[in-house]
Amino acid sequence: CIRDRFENFFSSTDAALSEKGHMFIELLFNDFIRFIGSDYTPLSVEEVTEASIACCVKQEIHGDYAINTYISMDLDTAIAFATRYVHEQFHSYDEYVQASLEDFLNLQNGLFIVNVSNTSNTELTLGAPEHITVSPIQFSGRTLHIPVLYTFGTIDFYMERVSIKE
């Protein structure tokens, strides 16, 4: 059950999350299962101030729950991720692979803001996905690193707090 997996994921960390934070992470795990596959293992969550990246996409969520979200992975993992996501074979990192990462993050965040609107009448908006090339990334707000190990590689997901009013 995704709820059990989710609860176990955070039980051994000091990474306390708000109600919307829990909603976001639970949706993220569900989206990984739905769009990429269930053959993953969540690794330990940690707070970080910076991250080394290779293939990285960022998207901002604006409003009363303002966060920056990042999905990052190495080149080979990005190619395998895109192959699973769009059900089409890729052999090199190109604009289609990058667009797949952007689309997954945009889909995840779009579903999240709809869920927030439906459950709490809070309107959030999304910025456009951005390809990040400067490494390491320096985070200015409290940032959780959520690594997820798939059979084809590790996906690093980051949630950077900007402004949360709850």
Regions found by a protein language model. Name each.
Residues 3-166:
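N-terminal auxiliary interaction/assembly segments of multi-subunit proteins
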